[in-house]
Regions:
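Gly/Pro/Ser/Thr-rich low-complexity, intrinsically disordered segments predominantly at protein N-termini
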Residues: 1-183
Length: 183
């Protein structure tokens, strides 16, 4: 007699909405995942990076910047809370009353001890599948930001910027961030 194979429950947006408010959750390919609260170092980097991005976006009047926790509804089985995201002016209609209902132009995830696989593999695949044009992965321990651009439905590394370098965005023309001001 062979053991019974049990299928994993697939969660939906409706299930996601029933999760407790006191925890941060994400829904990736129908799997409900809890995300621990970020540590102070993570928040420090996030705040500085968001400030620089928001300053550029506001000055140039090209869209809006949001930070976590902010739900990004991609479909009924995929709801994420990127650390930072940018939506261009021509796509502001995806900003709903309760969440972002569509694909941001740029997503930034900051790696933490518990999120390496999720951010570098699961979310990278997910964002590519949903056509997020630019994806940054911030690696605090390395004091590095990897910038990826979407080409043929796959992310290609545009550049891995170190702390001593100036980050240049391929899609946000004119954006330059001195990484020594972030790390």
């Amino acid at each position: 007699m062979s053991p019974a194979i049990t299928e994993k429950k697939r969660y939906t947006y409706e299930d996601y909405l029933k999760t407790p408010d006191d925890k941060r959750h994400e829904l990736i390919d129908g799997e409900l995942l809890m995300t621990p609260s970020p540590v102070p170092g993570h928040q420090r980097i996030s705040g500085k990076l968001e400030f620089k991005l928001r300053e550029f976006i506001t000055k140039n009047k090209i869209g809006e910047v949001f930070d976590a926790p902010c739900d990004v509804y991609l479909d009924n089985e995929n709801v994420v809370q990127p650390d930072i995201l940018f939506i261009s002016k021509d796509r502001l209609d995806i900003i709903g009353e309760k969440n972002i209902q569509g694909v941001p132009n740029l997503v930034i995830e900051i790696i933490s001890e518990n999120s390496v696989y999720r951010d570098m593999v699961q979310k990278k695949r997910l964002y590519a599948r949903f056509n997020v044009k630019e994806y940054w992965i911030v690696i605090p321990e390395e004091e590095e930001i990897e910038v990826y651009i979407l080409e043929d439905n796959t992310y290609q590394l545009y550049c891995a910027y170190k702390k001593v370098e100036e980050l240049v965005s391929p899609s946000l023309k004119g954006l330059k961030i001195e990484l020594k001001e972030i790390f």
